[in-house]
Amino acid sequence: MKDKFDKIMEQFLIPISDFEGPVMDSTYFMKNDGSFVFSEGYCHPEGAFWGMIIKYPLPGGHIDIFGREYSWTHRVEIDGELCIIPNHQQVENQFKVAPELRAFQGEKPPYARNFIKFPLSDFSGYFDARHSMRELRKEYKWIDEVVRKTCELLEWNPDDTGVTGSLAYGRIEDDVDMMFIGTPEENAAIAQKIRRYVESNPEARVFELGKEWPLRFYYAGTLICPFFRYADSEQIPLLDCDIEILEEGIAMEATVADDTHNLYLPAIVGLTDLRREDGSSEGDMELIIYNGALRGEVWKGDRIRINLTIINLTTPSAGTRRAALITEEDQYTIVEKH
């Protein structure tokens, strides 16, 4: 007999046999054991993807998902406040939950040091962002209203949105992780409208987990957590890339010259006026920010200080060029905000 969990999964989960790829960032997948796994970024191995187990079945676990007990790998409660577990500990937690994955890892590319490689064969299904949004809007009037009002504010078609987070698998929480699916130019325009709205309405600003989140905002009585996705996979800059490390631990200051792709994982920004700590200069280059918490953090005109890795970046469309890579939140600070 099917329980509530099974019935809701029938509504939201799409069989993995229907998955055509490529693996898009911020997509939830369900492992055969019932764990919820979140994909990270766009550059993935053939037949696998980089991601993290977020919630996993655990008898006696403190999270109720439609009548089944779960726990999570990335958060801990300290003195009554939720805190994010450091990245290295999150990675180790993956192997505590699924020790068989350790043998599958192999050598990781530098951008994936905080993620785990999962074979697609380990999954029963995935949660499509658009499909989940349609189901939620049909079933919950308040979600439909929030989506319509938010899209009206941002001058966007609500049918070109999706959801991620727990909403992707039908679990209702207080916030809406709304995904905007457009061209880089369209998504950039939405982000600028959000920034202008927050600047004009300071009460809409969001402070969580010890920081301000520049793209999150309160609207229509709800916390809106925007995510952005490329509508066309051909517009993804690093869908297929190769990275070779040249120098590590290089301290520089630079000015952001191009923020077209700063909304995604990875966030990619063009840098100019680069100065090493010793005073020597560098030519203009791209900075690849491979950390989901840093989406939308830096913008054109910002002067930033970064502790980075110099790499050779190779892509089919642009060949090989020098670039910079960071993967941790503490690897950059904003010296001067534009």
Regions found by a protein language model. Give the residues of each.
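Catalytic core of pol beta-like nucleotidyltransferases
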Residues: 2-174, 181-338
